[in-house]
Amino acid sequence: MSTLYLLANLRNRPDGRHSIDFGSLSARESDPVKMPHEITGLFSSDYCSSTSTTLEAEESEAYSKALSRNKRAAGILEHFLNGEQAAAHPSVCLQDRARLRLCEEAILVGAPRGTATRAREGIASYDKMEFLFPGSRQRKSIQMLHVSCPSLQPGATLLDSHSGSVHDSITILSGMCLFTRKILNSTTTNGRLDGQKLRHMPPTLYEMECIARLSAIIADVTTLTQSNFGEDNHPAVNIVLDLPSWHYYQFIEDCIKSDTCSLEEAIDWTEAIKLRRQQLASVLKKAVWHELGQRQVAHKSTLKAIQISPESTVVDELIKETLQRGHQPRLDDILHALSGTPHSLWPQFYSLLRDRDKPHSIRDLGFLFYVFQVVRPALLKAIPCQEAPSSKAPACEQPNLHRGQRQCLPQRPLIISLDDRAERKIYSQAHSLLLRLSRSSNQLVNPTLVQLYMPRRVYIDGNKDGQRLYWHDPSPVLPLLEGTKEQQRRDARNHDHHRRELQQTDILTELYGRDCSANIQGWFKEAGLC
């Protein structure tokens, strides 16, 4: 029996505290429901296909369809990333080339029927994939991934038969939120803004767990996409980390409009948000560089840069300047600033939007900006045939034309996103816009979007409502390690909780190992957050 992945269950207790326990999901062929993790709707693929499954017929069919659908997509991804030669000679290429191996095992997750999460996310299957790195310190990394790649045709490859690149550029895109929803709400209570509370907030469980989970998969995918190229034929590889800042203005907009807070409070609050974003970006970048180093590609010339939310600064600055002048930011002013920035790609993005998709509020714009970050790498390549690439663009974003490549040929940027499945609305809209861009009569670009989603490692109340950690993280309150009912009663009588309180780093150690936990704690200290 093999363990597929480790998980945690965060529970709301009757006494108002939170408790947490840990478990693992194993590959079982016929064992019905002796599921120690007690997570509703979470099963191994072996259990779902077993004749002894207790799933209702309709539910069993839904799980089976999800499993089959993702297995097909994962197979396309495996062939795509490994290239023609690896597909033809897997035993030979395995010895000296990084490659991806799709395994039989998978896990399936679905919130209970009738919940909003089930309606929004459906049932997702995550296939076990082994990233193999011969010759590096970390020779193998295992990920459970849900794959969506509608623009990839079966047989498509990243490498051609001569190990050359099919794509002109590769962008690895991921991101995370700041704080938790609960903490942000607590700083806007009764219309008053508490920026100082944000400034002194220690790292949340959500933030630390998200960095641990993202950094490894970012490094895995980046390494695989660049390590098989030679020095003379590699495409530009960029990592883009999208962390929000001005997007949180929606939290305080009503306070400002109703005059329940001062503009000075609003400025202090937004500056605290920007500081947190800067700190988290620093930690996440260090975590990614560390993981890349473990795979021995941290300083390879193919990796151009790690960028943080390109073109977002202009909105931050406009909101701050507007508040300092004693005015409230307006949507039209922000759109004008985005369009008026030299070398901005926002005008091209905005022209792709239908009228019904254009923003009517700053809240709408915040969502669209996430979509913009996904589409932006393709816009960088969407150059009319008669025009040369702009020499004024940042060096890390310069188009990379290989020897013998004609400039009037369609550019083929590859965008690989790594995220939580709850965010798939962003990528669905981005995919539609990329299709519209590729069909444009005046742009020569043929982008490919590959969406990879990771399963959650921390579930809330046994996944009974499909809730996410970001919304229900109890931080800064520490959860209690779940004990027996007798221990819980004894603790309640003695008011003795401290002996079983778990720090966020304790939880990381259980899920990701001691080294990962210690490293992340150290990087947070360097950023001034521990």
Curated annotation (Swiss-Prot):
Domain of life: Eukaryota
Top enzyme category: ligase
Pathway the protein takes part in: Secondary metabolite biosynthesis
Single Gene Ontology MF annotation: ligase activity
Motif stretch (Conserved DDXXE motif): 419-423
Family: Belongs to the arginine-containing cyclodipeptide synthase family.
Entry note about domains: The conserved DDXXE motif is essential for catalytic activity.
Protein name as it appears in the record: Arginine-containing cyclodipeptide synthase pthA
Record organism: Penicillium thymicola
Taxonomy of the source species: Eukaryota, Fungi, Dikarya, Ascomycota, Pezizomycotina
